[in-house]
Amino acid sequence: GLGRMGYTDPTRPPYSASDTETFYFKDVRCKPFTVDQIHYMVKAMGNSAMLCKRAGADAIELHCYGGYLIDQFQTARWNTRTDEYGGSFENRMRFTMEIIAEVKKMCGDDFPIIVKFCATHDMGEGGGYHDLEEGLKMAKMYEAAGVAALHVDVGCYDAWYKAITTCYNKEGHQLFAAKAVKEAVSIPVIANGDIWKPEDA
């Protein structure tokens, strides 16, 4: 989902983890999901994965990166909830962990789940973005939840050039994050970010 990233009609605010500003309209605030709506979204994600499996998909990838909806729940900057889905690191990860559990329930433990996530937003200290230390905690939590592989990314819309390679980025500009994740977990790690050399891959 897009959450605060949706290019929305200013009279119809999008939903997000919290009452946070939308990306394109700074004076428009998102509507926070209720707990019942979160539960509905978890069920919908599991059902969508099941439909993918029935259609012949070999695996699914959860889109937990870049400042999109799931990342909004995971990130303190955009998640200021005070219930079980906000506050602590574990609470901010709850939505994601419930989605993974629901996909496994609907598709079986043998159906591979790949998670694409930001090991770091790489935005410096402060501001509520997550850093590499928190990203490694996320990676270990994903592995413990039974995820088959991790697709590591860096950045978010607030610094989109770090997430989407431009002609100004150095080759392999995200490899530092993928390398750190690879050393922290035993499951396969997928890297991206202007990789041209086999030795870098």
In which residue ranges do the predicted regions lie?
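Flavin-dependent oxidoreductase catalytic cores
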Residues: 1-201
